Amino acid sequence: MEFFDLDLEVSQERLPAECSLNAPLNLSLSLQLFGRIEPKTENIRRQSRRITKVLRERHNGYRLQDLIIDSTRTQANLIPHLVSSASGDLNTPILEHWEMLSKYYQSLGYSLPSLDKFDFKESAGYWNAACSFRDMLLKSQKVEKKVNKQQTYVIYDITFEFVEGVVFIHGGEDGFNDGFLAGGAIAAMTYTELLALFKILNQRAQALLMCNISKGLEPDMVPSPSTIHSIYAEADHMLRMAGQGAIDLLKLWEPLVLTQLGDVLGDRFGLEDDFKLTIRTEAALLADQLNLKRSFARMTELIKSETRKQPLFQLFGLFKHFAYPRVYSRDTINTILGVSDKPSANDPEEYLHDQCEIRKEFYTRYVKAYHRAPQLDLGGLSPGSYLRRALEAGKMPNEKSPLYTNLEWFFVKFKKSIEWPLSDTLSTFLSDKAITQNRSTWLDNETSSRDNSEKRLLLKFIKENEDSVARVVAQAKEIYDNEDDRIIALKVKEMELKLKGRGFGLMTFKPRLLQVLRESIAKKTSKLFPEITMTASDLDLKKRKFLVSRKSDDRRGYVHMSKSLDINKFCTSQRQFNSQAVFQCLDELLGTGALFSRVHEIFEKTWIVDGSASDPPNLKKFKDRYQKLKDLGIDAPHTWGDGVFSGLMGGIEGLCQYVWTICLLLRVERVLSKTSLTHFVMAQGDNVIINLIIPIEIERDGSISPSEHRRVKSLSTSIDTQLAMELEKSGLTLKIEETLSSEHISIYGKDLHCPHHLTLSLKKAGSASIISSEQYQDVPTFLAGLSTSIETISECVNDKVSAHLFGVILAHAGWKSLCVSQTWKGWEYPYQKDETINRVRSQGIKLTEGEQVTVEKRLERNPDKRCLEWILATSFLGSALGMLPFPTPVDLEKRGVGDYITHRLALTKKALSSRVLPRRIEKLIRSMVNLPHSRETDLAKLFDSPFSLNLATEEDATSVIKRLARSTLRDLDIKNERLRAHIDIMDRGLQDLDRELGDSETINPRVAHLIRDITDEKESEMFVTKFATARTMRTVALENPQDVSVVSLLNKKSRAKETYTIWRSKRAPAEDWECSTQRAKIERDSSWGKNVIGVTSPSPVEAMSYRLVDPSTWEEEKKDQDFTINYYLSKPSLISHQARLERGPLVPYYGTQTQPLIAKAYNELKGNPKTNKALMLLSLRETIVKSGSNLDKLIMRLCERALDLDLNTLPSLRAQEEASSGEGIRGGIKESMSPVGPDNFYTNITHKVFNRRWLSGFHINIADFIIWGLTCTRKSITTQGTLSGNLPICIPACRGCLRRKEREFLDIDNPPRWECKEGVKDKAYMYFTTWCDLPRLSTLPSLDPQDAVFMIGRQLACSKGQDSGAATKFYNVSPESLGLLHPRMLLLGYSEGLIFSYLRSQHIVLGCLYHPTITELLPSLEKYTLETIDQHARQLGYLFQEEETAKELLNAGLCPYTPRAIPLTITELKNAVCITVSRSISVTLETKKSIHLMPESGISEEEVVAGRHAARTLGGLLNIKVPNLVYIDCDLTKGLLPWEPELPSEVLQSENFKIDGKRVTLYAKSQKRDNSIWEERGWTCSNSREILAKGVKTKSLFIHQSVPSHLDIDPALIVVIGGGLGGCVVPYLQHWRRPPVIFTTLFSERERISEDGDLIIPPELLVRGLSGRMVERELLEAELCDVTVPGNRKAIVDAVKRRIKPNESVLLIDEIENRGDAEDVLQQSISTLLQSLEKHCSLTSVHTIRESNVKHFTQRLNILRRGRYEANLFWNRYNRRDQYEALIVIPSESRMTECTFSVASVQAAFQKIDDGIEVEAKLEAHSWGLPELPPREKKILLGYVSSVFLKLGLVVIERHMSSTKLIDLLESAGPQMISWEEKQTHRSWASTDSIKEKGVTQDRIMALLCFAWTLKGLKHGVWDTNMDAVVEKTVYITHGPRLCALDEKPRVQYAEFKLQSKKRVEDLKGYLGALLHLETFFPLGDR
């Protein structure tokens, strides 16, 4: 339909946008072809020779050099000639379409007259000429371009002859005789110029035609056709006279029209007179130079004659083909810059203003200017006018419209109607910034806090406080000199130790203002430097690269070489000397005075404060110091020593980036301009990427000759050296080893075949080739999609690739028969017809004479073999891309690709280094991997993977591929036999892939996702997600060590899948309940009662009641209860995969490891009140089976419902690699990853809950839980004497109910039966929902109206405000009668429904059964009613608008209102509904069945308002009991005795040490020994439903348990600092029941989440809000009291003073462990705190100290001792030997002294204890002092140890756990870690040579070291803890072969190994630390 559009038909050669006549590209081509300048490529050179030959034959008598070539003149002669020769009647195309045209205009509200009413005059000539021209072009396109074939076409009397891509023009009169113009110019042009000529002709024809049509419709909107015609005639005349030169003049056409528009529109247009004058004089001068004065005068007259706005604007676009490149002549630019020489230039404001204008007009290419309508008065247009509509809507016309191309000229594509943005300040330049104006608070306030009070926007500030930006710039000098602005704070970026300008918000306002201005102004200049790509999009970059690299040559190849420059310390190197020149120029150009040139002063004179020392930085300290130094006349410090320095000569990261980039660019450009290669540069700060395009000759077979190789290589190195030299001039040094050149195909920005990284520009190319499974469902669609991707890739990488790529893909998919082989012509396919096979496939390749057109097809002797070789070779080349044919899931992202590539490359490398490949194949591969500048290296090295294997994500790429390929391809019903056969072949291909993977050394552990079904019982989760090899994994899964292929493993059915359950009970299988909605509804309907609590069916309300049991009788009682909670440890060990714990009935509690993921998700969800529960669920999800379990989906579903969002959209959940960013096990196994060991028995019961204060009763600060729990616990112990101090166990009252509910809600016991037929995942939710639905009428026994009303009430409450009409129809009750009949029943039904919907909502929010007691439920429900009051008022409001119903409710005691006036006001109504609903809820809950009448006196309105107010304040929350979600007893250590030595007491008696001549006592006491199990262990964590603690540290109980009996004080108060979860205080509370406790939590960056996995919960001081200042941190949304802040210490002291009388005893427990000497600030703070507390009370303090060496221990002890004489040391042996841990008790009454303990004395105390143990060991040589570990603990420890061995590739289970067996196992396992040449059948002789050279990796050696170390411990009882020494040692293998213990050097040595890898050294230390637990089993070794 687009009948004016040439491009649709002229398809082969679309014009590039630059193809206007004057595009430098085409002009240069013409000059090259006609031999005027040196041809750039071989192709043009050949063509040029042929053209010269033709010219010689033609113009025999002339010297060719004398001939003039000027296509512009030719055009100017040709167009008028063609137009005048054309007939005056309009040609056919218009007539054919006229009817359609008029219909179109009719739809716009115009009636178009018939054709004969129009007088087309001149337009007809243009139109007819354009049509004939188009016909000629289309014909010329279709003919084959054969060598030397000449074609001629005739238009009117002109002949066009096409020769060699050039067109000669003959005939006609006006000077076209014999192909000459006047003056000896040849009438000839290139084909591209001819196309451009047609474009011009076509555009003019359209313009005139549209003008004619519009003339009749909207005469005022368009200029007259004759005006346009005469303008065109003038233009032609000018071009004829001046040729190419006249184009410069025509370029000024748009500015000239602009000046006239300025005159017509006046001020509104905002053009300065200066500007108009400049343009006009400049144009006149140019016309004068070109001798076109008269012609130009006529033209300006034409412009001036048009005084109407709209027509004038239409003239704007007449010469748009000239406006494209906007290459202004130098004179023009100089003249315009001359504007700044006016006298006004002294005033900076004027000057800046002029600069703005000039840049605005000439540097922003206003090619879009004609798209913008200046504000036009649309009143003159008719209302139906298309133009008017487009303008008013501000949107573009419909491009699909048939006439769109006509519209393009006249109905300009308006983007939007704008005002010209020429304002009087620079502020249009600025990007606005938020800016804090005032920083006095920083300087004056000692505890500085961020000043959020006065945020102003920068521009607003300038507007209010300064006249203009110019004024600010003018003040730059004084700002620079101002001394008060000298202090700023910066942060140090820890990773790179660079200074980051992030803290520059602390600069004072003015310097910062300059900073922002400078950057913004510099940013504007980036228009002058298109290389700066900070803001460019990927598409822009790709376009730019593509445009630069276009090529049209045949066999000439191009190497795209990218160099990425990296500069040493870029910012620091930006000194004054190397940037000064550029900065001064910028200042001059922009007229900004000192803004840029003095930029370095700010850094040099400023005091830069280390802002990271404290946050926010304490500037007051520095200000005082600065003042002091200034007074002394000292300039400034030069060191960080005082946390400050000055005299910074370089720059600061993040400031002035733009201008420095410019400095760098200018240097780089200088070098590149000398190379004269096509290049483009991208720069961003110091990151400069240079893309060079180097032409090279490629041989016929596609290879590259060695000489070309060398040429490219030397070119590349010379550019490198040039760059280095040039940059050195400006003081910048290149990191040359990182300045890489790279070329070839890349994926994700990494080059696949050479170790160099590829650069920014290509990063996105690979993504094109990853195909999403949603887009391509079947093979054909897939292939179609693939080809488009290949196109995209070929834009970015060199051309050879796409051909290979396609072959690789086809070959790799197993569709082998689809591609037989590849030749330089392309791929040969088996289904091609013979004649096509032999033709050269690459079209457009020009052959030289005598070259064959066909290529002989050699018949292969063995085609199958050849095909296989090709496939093998191509699959090496495309190893990384082998996965492309399979659709991959979108979320696989880079990780899957990277891992897959790593696998493929590993296999390739293996094959290449095996030296087994035939030479032929190696040669093939070499030719494919032929990198022009690759260094001559071992081929295998090229296949080093650019990716590191990522172990932490869910599914391996290969398994995804297999899964998807199987499901998509097998399930398709493929009709095509041939294709089906291919798919079968592909299946076989997959199996091959499996075999390859099966043999590979390191299978990606993410295949675990599939293996996991089988290995559930066997594996420890840690092992699956970390370093297991394929072999180990299979060994574990299949119980036999031989290699099994992965495929058989994946297909093997799981023997016994284990489902992880939340909680369940033992019961007969027959009772299993199938979860189907129908079934649930039937149950509900059959058991429907009239009240909530029916006899037949228990409801959730009933299941909540409980009774308390005395713990002493629990053992007997639990036998009848048959409850077992299957409690899963977060890491099930290999054997005890079910860690069963005996405990109370309801413990849906999950141990988890929390990963950064949760913290991140938390931040993203902050502010969502439902966040907490969802996060708990998410962290649970981390630890359960990820794929096989239905539970996972349930959890995700719950989260999504809780948060109301799609979890996959959370960035943090998508970026899973970040989530598990634990870097292996460097520095010891990450403790949060480990299972349970002595150091963290409690890890798995702690939970990092992110809690925040929400305004509801269900989220309350966890601190309150603990304090409230402790208080209530104390209360219940004192009140219930019968329980003898123990807390009761809580069990359900109605066991049957619970049994039933349990079955219905969470039956997950039997996986095969656990399926919802309707796809319901969340059974509890389904239960609630179906329960609250209305039962079917037919299923109810009988229903009287009262019952129906009750049901409807219930339905109303559950239906969230939907219309109850349906329900009433259902129960045959008329809606009107509802209120009048039984309002009381309606209300009671409503309250019942409300209770249900509330319980349901709690289930959704909290994700597990909601079990509050009724007393707790009531206040929560009241609060809920208050919150949802509007909804209830809508549904029940009508009850209170009728007098009768209101009275009835009043009489029933449900309504508090005696109606005064009815209807009530809205507020009264809401209050009435609220109170009434609350009343009816309490009645329903309390009475269960009956309703008592209530007294008439209701609650007053004020009380309701007050109540609502209270409910909304935090204070109110504290009185509402928190619902008990879980009752918890987390005593993991039942029956585990603390170790105490049975020694004569004097061995450990106190000993006196001499210190500086004085005797000081240092006690070392052991813990008391008691034969009975500690009877009050129930205290570990209470069973009382009043306490909801998330796990108390059982270990701190061990440590503190014997201390209270040693203290002879009766404290009035206990203060706990850093007490974690409050476990440490429990023994003291047992000892003294009376004293209150204050918790305060120490906080430091390092201890947000402590290393052993428990959350440091910060109970503030007793109640919320007492501590001085709470700092909210991003990681933990809880208040933390930082004792290093003086205000907080004061608050603690105040809190203590308020609660005690003077000199009463206070006990302070300090649980801060692990403080090295770097923690001096903290230690000092605690010391200060202790001293200030001592002034007010008699202070006894207990401190936990755990240090790794005695020196630190002593230092800490001395600081804490506060000069006391003595300190008692309680030593806890339940610990590893490599730590010094003790409790230090410092009594209040001992005398003061100045002495300090020496390291020696403390060492002696520890020595004494150690000696004691040795003595004990000697006394009882037959048995070890540690009692036998209880079986459960033993299993846990064994699981830990065996999972460590598993990671080393060895299976250790229970039967191995005797020292002899373990020694045998390790001695024989060692040699098996090595690959021997042949199996060691005769074990006594093996030589060192028989060890394969590559068989021993660093990993293996690490394992050998671990084994040898263990052997030493097992044989000699020496468990060496000096890890640094161990890693240096050598391991030996002796005859047998067997492994020797460490330090044992055998006589016969088969082999010896030593660990080299640094990374492995760290890992090894971690492994050994973990294996140290073996000491628990074999403390004395073999003895």
UniProtKB/Swiss-Prot annotation:
GO molecular function: ATP binding; GTPase activity; mRNA 5'-cap (guanine-N7-)-methyltransferase activity; RNA-directed RNA polymerase activity
Subcellular location: Virion; Host cytoplasm
GO cellular component: host cell cytoplasm; virion component
Pfam families in the cross-refs: Mononeg_mRNAcap, Mononeg_RNA_pol
Record family assignment: Belongs to the rhabdoviridae protein L family.
Function field: RNA-directed RNA polymerase that catalyzes the transcription of viral mRNAs, their capping and polyadenylation. The template is composed of the viral RNA tightly encapsidated by the nucleoprotein (N). The viral polymerase binds to the genomic RNA at the 3' leader promoter, and transcribes subsequently all viral mRNAs with a decreasing efficiency. The first gene is the most transcribed, and the last the least transcribed. The viral phosphoprotein acts as a processivity factor. Capping is concomitant with initiation of mRNA transcription. RNA-directed RNA polymerase that catalyzes the replication of viral genomic RNA. The template is composed of the viral RNA tightly encapsidated by the nucleoprotein (N). The replicase mode is dependent on intracellular N protein concentration. In this mode, the polymerase replicates the whole viral genome without recognizing transcriptional signals, and the replicated genome is not caped or polyadenylated.
Protein name: RNA-directed RNA polymerase L
